Amino acid sequence: MRGSFALAGIAVLGCAAAVAAQDPGMSVRPFDMKHGGSPNVHMLAHVVTHKGAWKLADVEMEQDPGRPYVYACGFTNFDVQIYDVKDPSHPKMVYSWTIENPELHRGIGAMDGKYFKIGSRYYYAQSYQFMQGTPDADLGAVIFDVTGLPDPSKVKVVARIRYPKAPGGFHNTFAYKHSDGRVLYFATVNEGHALVYDLDKVVSGADSSTWLIGEVPNPTPFKAFGTASYHDFYVGYDAATHQDKFYGAGLGGYSVWDVTKPEAPKQLFTITGLGLDIAHTFTPSPDGKYAVTETEYQYTPLKIWDLTDGQDGKTQNIDTPISGWTADWRDLSHNHEVRWPYVFVSAYEDGLQIFDLKNPLAPKTDGHYYTCECTHEHGFGGTPDNGWESTISVEQGAFGVDVRNYDGLIALSDMRTGLWLFRMDGFKGWNGHAVGMPNISSVQDYDHGPDGAPKPATSPGMGRQ
């Protein structure tokens, strides 16, 4: 990682003052002492999900009180596991599924998962990534009907989304309840755009040629490596402008699009500048005024941006963050969930980290819990032939994080150690209205649509009947 992205590291040094990263002169915890957590973060359960060196990629929690299910993406194990966490101190695996003939497959496997609801039925989409020359190189996602949980006999595969034009599968995805009533599935692909699928068409048995309804171009490709694709994105409703907006991390920078008509996206503005190579994750605040971004290389902090001038149409590009945050300047934070003013971070070797943006100019750490307990810089890299292990990578440990809005339960997936469940003192759930914000987050209201959106003129689909 260091050698490949040395030039990007130099670029970050040039903007260190602007992002106000943790002072490298500050005392940091020795790597062999990263155990346990802060007094306000309580570990409820830990499940070692697999026997091998690599356990999980992402994690997803259902949000309805009557459905206490957590989905763990099995990464290079090529499987998905579903846990009943009705008693969060004693998770119970109720279902697992592995790709057929796993021994014939090569790749990073089961990466990202999203649950969604259409009509009265619940579904789960598991994304996959397999190498060319092996089975299912064109497979993007497997869709399960999970309405009948916790009975495993009632879980059924109902569709598979394939994209043979660009083999390699879907690295990241986002399920979104659009303001027009449709449930859409945004997916990364090895091309210069994100794909947009109509999930009702996918699960209802419609002709597969009708599933794909739109593409969101990537205006910020990673030119140094010839990479045109998005890495990740967030989609949310802007209650002030009555627009559905797409926030894309395009590896060479970030972009915001109006996807109110997903068949014809309109670019609004970009974030580009020094130190933004490998632009990885882009998450706005509920009102779209601020955003948290991640760039995927060692020593870089999460950056905080004021998006106001871009959202108001005063500029086409923003190039200077207003602050930054890091758990440990020697490492790298990964994915994050915003529940304003809190940001919940899956911080690779630094486990679960929680900071707040009560003052966006001065982010403050609120709690942590170390989950990796791993050897520093022996993270993910290489190929299947060397067990995917590197001696220069910090990409190991906490991979994904999710927050259950109705009660504040925190789920975290760790690449090395498996599934973890937590609670934080004083955080008993989240509703944007309680903090003076729209009730907008990555959590979707599949029954009513986005907070603040007019009722759609047409009824949404009913799913598979």
Sequence positions of predicted segments:
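Bacterial N-terminal signal peptides that target proteins for export
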Residues: M1-A8
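N-terminal signal peptide c-region/cleavage motif recognized by signal peptidases
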Residues: C15-A16
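Feature marking well-ordered beta-strand scaffolds used for ligand recognition
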Residues: A21-Q465
